[in-house]
Amino acid sequence: MKLAYWMYAGPAHLGTLRVASSFKNVHAIMHAPLGDDYFNVMRSMLERERDFTPVTASIVDRHVLARGSQEKVVDNITRKEKEERPDLIVLTPTCTSSILQEDLQNFVNRALTLKDSHADVLLADVNHYRVNEFQAADRTLEQIVRFYIEKAKRENFDFSKNQKISANILGVFTLGFHNMHDCRELKRLLTDLGIEINEIIPEGGNVTNLRNLPKAHFNIVPYREVGLMTAMYLKNEFQMPYISTTPMGILNTAQFIREIETLLKALTQNLSNSSNCEKFNISFAEEAAKILEKDFQKYISEQSRFVSQAAWFSRSIDCQNLTGKRAVVFGDATHAASMTKILSCEMGIRVVCSGTYCKHDADWFREQVRGFCDEILITEDHSQVGDMISRLEPAAIFGTQMERHVGKRLDIPCGVISAPVHIQNFPLGYRPFLGYEGTNQIADLVYNSFTLGMEDHLLEIFNGHDTKQILPKIQFEDGSLEWSKDALEELSRIPGFVRGKVKRNVEKFAQQNNKPFITLELMFAAKEAVNA
């Protein structure tokens, strides 16, 4: 546990609460002291939803510490069951309340013996000291799915496959980066291919429908952070294949579609080789044949040329102005890796550093971005990211809300491509990052993130209606250095898009030569030293 004023991935209980509050008619009870109960406020502020956050805090106070938590926790479970009538109640401690080392599973068992209802009660099986928000969310989703699958098995539920080819989408949940928009785009893409959606979990799903997950023919995991454990469990239990390629960018989306085609061919081949000629198998083979009759490559070509504008835009003169420009990418493993490939392969932008805060997925991330960037950074420390950006001085940053703050401080534009984000990245309008419509959004974001230069320079030359002075914008930050009036005037004549870099180079030269007062002559000397 460490004290920090900024964390990329939150504590484990946030992941559990995000999964629980994504399902319909599921209530979460958080066993926590005051100060850990900020999830309700955070979700109500950020997520654009009409419903209240279904989370109740069972506060650990001095009375609880004096006589134990069992009575209070059990009372909260039974009370919420009567008030909300949920299908499932999820109990979770926080890293703080875990210090008490209480037997919460015993509390759950006690509540189950006292209450008389249909609601299930589940203790989130998460180690709050060893995992972060994403790992806990992944584990909690898998635990809930496993619970209801095992329950269906005991009831001898029929897990036979759907007549029509269908897929589950796993890992779309509340407070995700553009998750709702991405889900809509994925549904559109699958509909175009003739594939039905079986279940989408956890966002908007019912836990009572989790028993239907094995009826689909394959699973889709659009984000590595959440959903992989569930997909692996379903594969081991029901031999369900899954696709974990994120369809972000033209190349990755094409690869995603080709993987679906390959998967359907493999399923059809397995059925044709099987000696079992049931009516269902024949029906499935016919459905698969209809889908495979479509020219997948033709679909990819048409979507890339006519639906996605990014392909031709990347070859236009506007985008060619960005060729060779330097950029830094940082975010979660899924979005940072995909964005690195898009910038490098599709837009010709040089990625000087690509990084992620998902340390648990570091090996996969390195494998994905190796060869597409100059440096790789794996860290949860925002100060290291800020130092790296300051050292490399890129033309643009693509990162989280924290990199946006760093960019403002260093006067470097930043496009937000990954959680954690603030409310402006929970748009009401349709803004997916996945699929072919997502390529248009990404192309706009990339192009608009770079400072074009001449616009700012011309505004400074001609001023327009702006009567503000320019000089106060370029005051030095280091109190040990002082600029002469002539040097400041010369600095103001330098175009805005390179002025910051020139200023930093001059100050660095002055510090190296122990010159506390920067004159016009020192500026010219610094210029000669840099050019040399």
Swiss-Prot record:
Residues that span the membrane, as ranges: none
Keywords: 4Fe-4S, ATP-binding, Chlorophyll biosynthesis, Chloroplast, Iron, Iron-sulfur, Metal-binding, Nucleotide-binding, Oxidoreductase, Photosynthesis, Plastid
Pfam short name (any one): PCP_red
GO annotation, biological process: light-independent chlorophyll biosynthetic process; photosynthesis, dark reaction
UniProt: substrate binding residues: G453, M454
Cellular compartments annotated: Plastid, Chloroplast
InterPro entries reported for this sequence: ChlB/BchB/BchZ, LI-POR_suB-like_C, Nase/OxRdtase_comp1, P-CP_red_C, Protochl_reductB, Protochlorophyllide_Rdtase
Any GO MF annotation of the entry: metal ion binding
Annotated metabolic or biological route of this protein: Porphyrin-containing compound metabolism; chlorophyll biosynthesis (light-independent)
Gene3D superfamilies in the record: 1.20.89.20, Nitrogenase molybdenum iron protein domain (3.40.50.1980), Proto-chlorophyllide reductase 57 kD subunit B (1.10.8.550)
Disulfides per UniProt: none
Annotated GO CC locations: chloroplast
Reactions the enzyme catalyzes: chlorophyllide a + oxidized 2[4Fe-4S]-[ferredoxin] + 2 ADP + 2 phosphate = protochlorophyllide a + reduced 2[4Fe-4S]-[ferredoxin] + 2 ATP + 2 H2O
Manner of cofactor binding, per the entry note: Binds 1 [4Fe-4S] cluster per heterodimer. The cluster is bound at the heterodimer interface by residues from both subunits.
Active site positions, chain numbering: D318 (proton donor)
Family annotation (SUPFAM superfamilies): Helical backbone' metal receptor
Required cofactor(s): [4Fe-4S] cluster
Coiled coil: none
EC number: 1.3.7.7
Residues that hold [4Fe-4S] cluster according to the record: D36
Subunit structure: Protochlorophyllide reductase is composed of three subunits; ChlL, ChlN and ChlB. Forms a heterotetramer of two ChlB and two ChlN subunits.
Function text: Component of the dark-operative protochlorophyllide reductase (DPOR) that uses Mg-ATP and reduced ferredoxin to reduce ring D of protochlorophyllide (Pchlide) to form chlorophyllide a (Chlide). This reaction is light-independent. The NB-protein (ChlN-ChlB) is the catalytic component of the complex.
Protein family: Belongs to the ChlB/BchB/BchZ family.
Protein name, as recorded: Light-independent protochlorophyllide reductase subunit B
Species name: Tetradesmus obliquus
Organism phylogeny: Eukaryota, Viridiplantae, Chlorophyta, core chlorophytes, Chlorophyceae
Gene: chlB
